[in-house]
Amino acid sequence: MKFQRLALILALIFSNFFAYTQKSGGGEANPNLHTNKEALARFQDNRFGIFLHWGPVTLRGVEIGWSRGTAVPIADYDALYKEFNPTLFDADAWIKTAKASGMKYIVITTKHHDGFCLWDSKFTDYDIMSTPYKKDIVKDLAVACKKYGVDFGIYYSIADWHHPDYATRYGGDPRPVKSSEMSRYVTYMKNQLKELIDNYDPTLIWFDGGWEECYTHEMGMDLYAYLRQLKSNLIINDRIDKGIVGMEEKKYEHPEKYAGDYETPEQRIGAYKVDVPWETCMTICQQWAWKPNDTMKGLENSLLTLSKVVGGGGNLLYNVGPMPDGRFEKRQTDMLLDMGKWLDKNGEAIYKTKGGPYEPTPDFVSTRKGTKIYLHILTKDLTEVTLPIPEKVKINKIVKLEDGKSIVFDTVDNNIKLRLTPSTAIPYVVEIETNTDTKQLKTIKRNVY
């Protein structure tokens, strides 16, 4: 009897642990609706994507959505679409740049908090077809992604401060609010999302703006179930619901309650979690939408961020704000292409990998795939690293990934000591070939020196 009681207690403990580490799916209202495993695996294998924040607001060079009623008066902001004519937009050029930069998927802001739609929507006139440009941006990008083998994802804001039925106002908007109209807005939102899925077939939907009180946990779970009925292998981020781990670092109290397939830390590198899918979204400059002369992150910073994110178990969604005329800034394009050159030599340590097994340190992070462990060196002029090696794991050889040059190492007890040639070019990757399936290794704590 005592054994049975102990077994029951252990079962409850591990079931709660499993619910935490595997947080994903339709939430408590849809207990049998789980994340599509194959689609999630593809998403995680991609590891690196491009985020694109774009719309008429770029004509003013201020932030998308948030500047409505603040930096730009509401009436002026809402009329910007009448001037929006990005005649130099070339979907093929965008996607070829993304692909050459090593990015495996895109996410485009089809509708931000300002409510403007970048596609030809039959449910509103506040869209791209009402601009002087009169061409479907989303359609062109979807076609280009298919042409060049890049996964196509869409951003869609739940918050819509322009729509009369959305039951929250922002930026001093004087229009009255009627909470009873929110149900009409939800219908509008579902109609638009069905339109986007039917017409453009995205692999993922990246929600945002669900934090306001007029949008509820129940609405989030219902919307998730609705979308998965429309497309069973759709991947949906956690911002569809109310339990996000995002900008405010709000932690899940009961993660299994909430809908969503992966977590979305914003403008920060997520914590080391290799059993919970997550994606850091971060800007290449300071602002999400284009801003003239915005401060831009350099190549080293960008590559270090990529290594740290993937070494922690996450994806990196790196944001570019296209200019009003439809082009990427040359300096941003050049930097992204330089990232692509690094990935041409080191991508094996990024794509289709799992974070770990070594817990991240200031000097390095690690990724793994097959029988190999990849050590991403983050510190300049590092000359030596000592690593504990799990029992029964044998080291066959160690090389620098980019050129295949051997790295001298010594084995002492259950540790290996790597002797590195000092380098000022970081990150660089050391490939450790073992005799075991490295993805099965447990996390090795930071008792390294």
Segments (PLM) and residue ranges:
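Mature catalytic domains of secreted/periplasmic carbohydrate-active enzymes
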Residues: 22-449
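Bacterial Sec-dependent N-terminal signal peptides
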Residues: 1-24
